Amino acid sequence: MDPKISEIRKSYTLSSLEIEDAGSDPVLFFQKWFEEAVQSEVLEVNAMTLATVTQDGKPDARIVLLKGILKESFLFYTNYESRKGTELETNPNVCLVFFWPELERQVRIEGNVTKVSREVSKEYFHSRPRESQIGALASPQSQKIPDRKFLEGRFQKFTNQYQNKEVDLPNHWGGYAVYPCRIEFWQGRSSRLHDRIVFERDTSSSWEKFRIAP
């Protein structure tokens, strides 16, 4: 291993996390942390790793953007025919990870996904920049394409098709809601003795809260 890589390390000293601080509702506590990250001007504060599993059990992950919290679920939008979309169709279990280094914090959310209603997807779709709406139509996401000109040609085709018209929400595009069953809040501490507070749903659908070792 390159010694320069192995020597990279940082001591975390900004804050602490007591179990009492997390309250009784992990979604509300997430919103509190998220707002603090926004106020701290974290770059791409809503960026999160979305981990999925392929049909043959291989892990897969990518960065997507959180686009809302609705009825205790975390929302993101994508092409349903993309690689992630096909994986979610066969296995709805996912994990989300937020990392906010400016605050020395991480949040892990385990749960399962369901598609949101077409009405919810349509409302968000039409809130996007027009170019992004056309891009969703033009891009056969995760499919092989011959070159970039192919993509640019499709973009121009749909730009012309929808000139002076509202862009239709594609049938293959929409939102997912992640319903959590476990949420972990991680606060960096000195000596690698980090604070880790976990909320886990029990059989009664209420939350159990406990501390785990770093």
UniProtKB/Swiss-Prot annotation:
| Disulfide-bonded cysteines | none
- Cofactor(s) for this UniProt protein: FMN
- Identify the residues that bind substrate: 9-12, 67, 124, 128, 132, 192-194
One GO BP annotation is: pyridoxine biosynthetic process
Q: Which UniProt keywords apply?
A: Flavoprotein, FMN, Oxidoreductase, Pyridoxine biosynthesis
What Pfam families does the database record attribute to this sequence? Answer: PNP_phzG_C (PF10590), PNPOx_N (PF01243)
Q: Name the source's superkingdom.
A: Bacteria
Protein function: Catalyzes the oxidation of either pyridoxine 5'-phosphate (PNP) or pyridoxamine 5'-phosphate (PMP) into pyridoxal 5'-phosphate (PLP).
Instruction: Supply the name of the protein.
Output: Pyridoxine/pyridoxamine 5'-phosphate oxidase
Write down the species.
Leptospira interrogans serogroup Icterohaemorrhagiae serovar Lai (strain 56601)
